[in-house]
């Protein structure tokens, strides 16, 4: 395994030894990263992902994937890639578990709505909210002075969770669209990034990112097929495929030719051809599961092999080495991701559903602002009262909304509408 250092396992806030161990208890022999993973696994923030949208909402269909089930799948894939590359598997696993922990209700639609209402405090970004939850909002470690350190994860764990390891605003004043830290959290990010000589994410974060792409593309396509939104026969319809490739390249980058090549290589796989005949029978469900299993193994195995070949003789870990994704795997994953996203987006009810979701977020924001601090939960109420500016107060309100489940947000939106109607 890669030789992780004491600095990698260092935590921002020193912790006292546990005092409640039974005298007969065995000494805790877990590594720092195993403890980190346990903290994420037992966090309320992770549990709340069970009631947050993945591609379709948690209440659409009998067994749709949620942000939580998606995160568990990402963690399992990341753990496998990490083990294959001799990285710490717990470190890769926890990066997968918490990669979406900052996502608000309604996924990217909710993220865009919150970014609008958060303009006065610098905007909203799901990846930056992940860091904020891990280092501030999730209650675990609090200093004697009352400062929250969130889960107080190790440096390497936080680094593995940072997909875009830079703050919103650059030194020259330019602004990044994607980032892993709000400007007010830049000091925390600087502590995390000690030892890095460039802006590349550590290889554990690269593993998490590609594992997310694998899970998103393969498993969410499975959900789309079962829900009737996706038909794999499009891979053989060259006219529709060309239009889809154009949309996918515009949405995710690359060229249409790359996506068409991905479709061509997928057509050659017997498991894909078998799954394309999905008819809701027992045999077709089994064929679909066979396809998802084989595709995940295909992308994991080829990426491990390519990375090992490129870095032969080198200890890969942290800021040493990059994940090498074969071109065929990359093009297939991008094509499947296009299928998963665009067919849902083209659903006639999708735009109307998104508008309703945005309206709920705006309504709850207004309700909390007008009633603050009394309208806030006790923990957020305390932060609101202690805030030094209106901008900081808005950030606290946005933090609370982002942490809500969709069910709770919808209940609060109904209450806000009832109060608004009563007041005229």
Curated annotation (Swiss-Prot):
It comes from the Bacteria. PROSITE patterns: HD. Gene3D superfamilies: Hypothetical protein af1432. Residues 8-18 have a biased composition (Basic and acidic residues). SUPFAM superfamilies: HD-domain/PDEase-like. Keywords: Hydrolase. Residues 1-27 are annotated as: Disordered. Residues 67-217 form the HD domain. InterPro entries: dGTPase (IPR006261), dGTPase-like (IPR050135), dNTPase_2 (IPR023023), HD/PDEase_dom (IPR003607), HD_domain (IPR006674), PHydrolase_assoc_dom (IPR026875). GO terms for molecular function: dGTPase activity. One of its GO terms (biological process) is dGTP catabolic process. HAMAP family: dGTPase_type2 (MF_01212). NCBIfam families: dGTP_triPase (TIGR01353), PRK03007.1 (NF002829). Belongs to the dGTPase family. Type 2 subfamily. This is Deoxyguanosinetriphosphate triphosphohydrolase-like protein.
